[in-house]
């Protein structure tokens, strides 16, 4: 701005603008700065302006000052210190933040989320007062979940979080094609084959029956018990074979393989026998073709567990599961990172993820008009766990009632499984030698039994 043909002189002023050189601005903004001169600032200090110069209004000064400040780069702000959270309220491990209302570690956050989303039902095999810390947190799922509630973790937070994710993905779900990737297709085929080759379907078996205690319930029919325990031992060996054929299972530590097999063995045994249920005769058929009615199953050793198992078998009928779905569900039961005492639970969880995805896609492709069938089938795992927990207690009762007749492999599979007490005070030295169901490779030049789980 000029007046009377000459520019107003601009004296040096003490202020923030004097610390920055003016020369770069014409270089950076030549079209804007080139034709302008800075306004005089005399009026700010009470000095009259030189003749011929007008005093700018305060509004003009404020506007121009602000504009000038915007051109000046500010020094970078120092980074805030990292936020420090209180230890996990549940197990006292290092917290990763506030999850579901409390400070929690990643392990307890994931455990609580899975427990709520899957409606898990846990059982404490002690006095429901187990100590939960970073060392013991995987030993009792019941007490760990109760501790989560006690410290203030919120069910609603999990559900709200889930609903939020559902809304965010609802548009994607409408257009989802549910096509198998090559990897998932290969995984599904391997599991179907592993299941079929370790568990023949009902239509492949030549059924035969027995008249032994078929009409009325008794406490225990020793003849049926001997036959049942022999068949159960063979079934366990087939489950071990099935597990070893699951992609990735043998890549786990030996300890984790055994932990998973012990924890899931009864689940899979019950699932398998229930798929061989014939509702018209109310019978179940074993792998050698032996077919027992409900009364005989009770007398063979199932006892108070009998009606629970038959009810579960009836609930499976409307689901019309095929061999692929049964195999995948068995694999999901087995490979589960929630099992206590695992060395690498995160690795197990990651191994389970493609199994869940494969089952979801397979079910929805097979039943496109029944979108809710996948969660219905998956929820059967909760029922299986509840029944198998009672089944483990039943085996312990049988061990006390008929000492010396418990097959060693059944005993081993249930020993310390999911928090159960050992069936015997110490491992038997040479019982495995006398079991016709255990391969001779289980015993190597010694009278000491060696677990077939690690062969």
From Swiss-Prot:
Gene3D superfamilies: Erythroid Transcription Factor GATA-1, subunit A, Retinoid X Receptor. Residues 183-417 form the NR LBD domain. GO terms for molecular function: DNA binding; DNA-binding transcription factor activity, RNA polymerase II-specific; heterocyclic compound binding; nuclear receptor activity; nuclear retinoid X receptor binding; protein-containing complex binding; RNA polymerase II cis-regulatory region sequence-specific DNA binding; sequence-specific double-stranded DNA binding. A zinc finger (NR C4-type) spans 88-108, 124-148. Disulfide bonds: none annotated. One of its GO terms (biological process) is neural precursor cell proliferation. Residues 154-182 are annotated as: Hinge. Residues 88-153 bind DNA. GO terms for cellular component: chromatin; cytoplasm; nucleoplasm; nucleus. Expressed in aortic endothelial cells (at protein level). It is found in: Nucleus; Cytoplasm. The modification Phosphoserine is found at residue 77. InterPro entries: NHR-like_dom_sf, NR_DBD_RAR, NR_LBD_RAR, Nucl_hrmn_rcpt_lig-bd, Nuclear_hrmn_rcpt, Retinoic_acid_rcpt, Znf_hrmn_rcpt, Znf_NHR/GATA. Receptor for retinoic acid. Retinoic acid receptors bind as heterodimers to their target response elements in response to their ligands, all-trans or 9-cis retinoic acid, and regulate gene expression in various biological processes. The RXR/RAR heterodimers bind to the retinoic acid response elements (RARE) composed of tandem 5'-AGGTCA-3' sites known as DR1-DR5. In the absence or presence of hormone ligand, acts mainly as an activator of gene expression due to weak binding to corepressors. This is Retinoic acid receptor beta. It comes from Homo sapiens (Human). The gene is RARB.
